[in-house]
Amino acid sequence: MSSDLTAYVRSNRERYEQEFGDFLRIPSVSTEKRYADDVSRCAEWLADIVREAGMDNVEIIPTEGNPFVVADKIVDPDAPTVLVYGHYDVQPVDP
């Protein structure tokens, strides 16, 4: 890791930990209907974070189930594409 990146991460560590804690406190249990509003709130939270991170286009796509969050940043349309996939929901304690 470059020294500039290391310094940046270290200087923002508390903020990152706070944001991650905020994220983890949202009970986004996707398999239980009673948490549907929380799953949507979590999608909104995630969309806000990726907007703040500089994504150009951020969209929350509703589905019959839980919403998708899709974001992109096109730096150079001729450059290779990098895809990052993850999930923001959690599973119940006793699946």
Question: PLM features: residue spans?
Answer:
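Acidic/His- and Gly-rich active-site-bordering loop/insert found
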Residues: 2-95
